[in-house]
């Protein structure tokens, strides 16, 4: 992997832009400082090729062209620091991969039931992972398409009485036990055969036109039974695979705000908040395609009822298209800031409207809102074990580039083997040492695979120090390995054989040369020569308790403005230097 740091605009001098771990969400928003952990997702719709593909794969050449379309889409999503792609996998009783249960969808080859000559789901997953993005299989559950279309006809033939006709369309009966069993088999097949990061259930509810004859409580039990069956089948295969769904954007009526009769819990029997509480869902993507009082209080309700899980409201950016609605860009950006302020992620519906840059939404996302990469929050409710940190972090200068290499150990700190198939790595860079891996602005590469990265160091504001962490499939991150050798090199280069000064318990002990110097005060600098703090002393030590962990240079200043360098000192947390 080769990455241009300057082009990504990811490196700032964190000695100037540092924020403590205790910073409030409001201060981070005020400073346009994004959080380190945040889901930034997009729905990639394949039905009819409305997001992708835009051409059919009917030959080797056209298949490659179709693949390249997806590559270009993912490249642009990566530049906007999108970290999760929800790709429509089960379309309408049809698939974008070779399934033992259902036929090919026609969006790929142009002919329902015909292979495009490659496995589109496998290709999408691989390309997402190359870019550090999660790839979730979006499974449309209850609707199975037009009554006489291939997917619906196939299911009607195999399961007599299972499919109900409403208007021109067919729907799986949520009250029939076979629906839960069948959908669980499909999701198990996907989870077992693919390195998918999540199973994303769409339309896991009663159709709004369904004549529900049972009580609403009984209806919720029927829908939850389907969710339970799918959850068991997925977690049995791979417990690190995320379970998510896209419920109606308003869970239910609130005390002061009415849902206008369109809500998840009462109208269509989705107990989505209950699924979070019981552990059936790891993530929710509520479809919050609303504005103003129909958005903000309901978003707060989702946040308050998250039960420690991940909530990523979907934003209706399609309304920015004048053919779809009369929304303004400010309607969406205010919602994005609100979601970040209450600790929620954001998901765009849908990909085309983001990449078409409707009213500047792509520019805002990539150049203002998501300035830095982010990590998906860890599934600590599934596992809290911490991987062993990488080791032997080395740098090699090659012209205007630097190559970082390191070693990974597929073990947790408790000595057990890592239970997920991959160890991912996150790479950080900064102009101060040690690199603060809790500062999102220092994250330059997230969730990368492999143990090497090449960085383009063209430009004047390049980092001098690097850190790498390991991360398992649950998202649990290790302690960092720091590029200590680089610090030593810089010390020797800048100070020659400068004396190492002793510090302990917030005190820096002055050398004899300092006691005898005609100094009115002392200056603390960074290794790059940036003045950080002026200190005065009436004894044999200086109070340095206000300085953060790092490496510093101590100088004297006299009345004539003459400066003398005494040496360097390290401050290490919980250690004496």
Name each region found by the language model:
Residues 37-39, 43-67, 136-193:
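Active-site-adjacent "subsite" loops/lids of carbohydrate-active enzymes
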Residues 68-94, 193-196:
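Catalytic domains of carbohydrate-active enzymes, especially glycoside hydrolases
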Residues 80-116:
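Aromatic-lined carbohydrate-binding/catalytic grooves of carbohydrate-active enzymes
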Residues 134-146, 200, 219-265, 311-314, ...:
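Aromatic-lined carbohydrate-recognition surfaces of secreted/lumenal glycan-active proteins
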Residues 272-273, 277-295, 312-383:
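Substrate-binding cleft of secreted/luminal carbohydrate-active enzymes
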Residues 364-417, 475-490:
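Pro/Thr/Ser/Gly-rich low-complexity, intrinsically disordered linker/stalk tracts
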Residues 457-477:
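Beta-strand-rich modules
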Residues 490-495, 509-512, 549-577:
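C-terminal tail/sorting-segment detector
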């Amino acid at each position: 992997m080769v990455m241009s740091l300057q082009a990504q605009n990811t490196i700032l001098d964190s000695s100037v832009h540092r924020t403590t771990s205790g910073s409030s969400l409001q201060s981070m928003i005020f400073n346009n400082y994004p959080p380190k952990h945040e889901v930034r997702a997009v729905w990639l719709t394949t039905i009819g090729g409305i997001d992708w593909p835009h051409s059919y794969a009917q030959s080797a050449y056209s298949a490659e062209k179709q693949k390249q379309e997806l590559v270009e889409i993912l490249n642009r999503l990566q530049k906007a620091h999108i970290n999760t792609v929800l790709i429509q996998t089960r379309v309408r009783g049809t698939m974008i991969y070779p399934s033992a249960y259902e036929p090919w969808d026609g969006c790929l080859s142009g002919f329902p039931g015909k292979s495009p000559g490659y496995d589109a789901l496998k290709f999408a997953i691989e390309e997402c992972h190359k870019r550090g993005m999660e790839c979730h299989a979006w499974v449309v559950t209850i609707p199975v398409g037009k009554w006489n279309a291939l997917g619906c006809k196939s299911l009607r033939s195999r399961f007599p009485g299972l499919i109900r006709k409403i208007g021109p369309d067919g729907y799986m009966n949520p009250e029939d036990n076979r629906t839960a069993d069948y959908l669980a088999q499909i999701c198990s097949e996907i989870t077992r055969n693919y390195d998918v990061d999540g199973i994303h259930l769409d339309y896991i509810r009663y159709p709004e036109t369904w004549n529900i004859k049972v009580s609403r409580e009984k209806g919720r039990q029927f829908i939850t039974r389907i969710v339970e069956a799918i959850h068991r089948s997925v977690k049995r295969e791979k417990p690190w695979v995320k379970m998510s769904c896209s419920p109606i954007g308003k869970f239910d009526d609130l005390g002061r705000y009415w849902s206008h009769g369109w809500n998840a819990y009462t109208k269509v029997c989705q107990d989505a908040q209950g699924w979070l509480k019981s552990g059936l869902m790891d993530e929710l993507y509520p479809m919050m395609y609303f504005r103003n009082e129909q958005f903000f209080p309901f978003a707060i309700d989702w946040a308050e009822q998250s039960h420690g899980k991940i909530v990523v409201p979907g934003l209706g950016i399609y309304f920015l298209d004048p053919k779809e609605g009369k929304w303004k860009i400010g309607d969406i950006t205010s919602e994005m800031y609100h979601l970040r302020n209450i600790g929620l992620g954001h998901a765009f519906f849908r990909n085309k409207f983001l990449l078409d840059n409707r009213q500047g939404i792509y520019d805002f996302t990539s150049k203002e809102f998501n300035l830095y990469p982010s990590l998906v929050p860890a599934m600590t409710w599934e596992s809290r074990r911490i991987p062993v940190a990488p080791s032997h972090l080395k740098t090699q200068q090659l012209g205007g580039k630097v190559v970082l290499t390191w070693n990974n150990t597929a073990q947790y700190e408790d000595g057990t083997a890592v239970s997920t198939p991959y160890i991912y790595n996150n790479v950080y860079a900064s102009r101060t040492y040690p690199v603060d891996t809790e500062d999102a602005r220092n994250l330059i590469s997230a969730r990368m695979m492999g143990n090497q990265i090449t960085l383009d160091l063209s430009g004047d504001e390049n980092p001098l120090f690097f850190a790498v962490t390991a991360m398992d499939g649950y998202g649990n991150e290790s302690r960092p390995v720091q590029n200590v050798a680089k610090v030593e090199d810089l010390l020797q280069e800048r100070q020659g054989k400068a004396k190492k000064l002793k510090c302990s318990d917030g005190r820096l002990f002055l050398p004899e040369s300092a006691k005898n110097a005609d100094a009115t005060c002392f200056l603390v600098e960074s290794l790059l020569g940036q003045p950080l703090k002026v200190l005065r002393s009436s004894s044999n030590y200086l109070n340095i308790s206000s300085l953060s962990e790092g490496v510093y240079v101590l100088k004297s200043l006299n009345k004539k403005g003459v400066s003398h360098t005494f040496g360097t000192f390290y401050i290490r947390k919980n250690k004496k230097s």
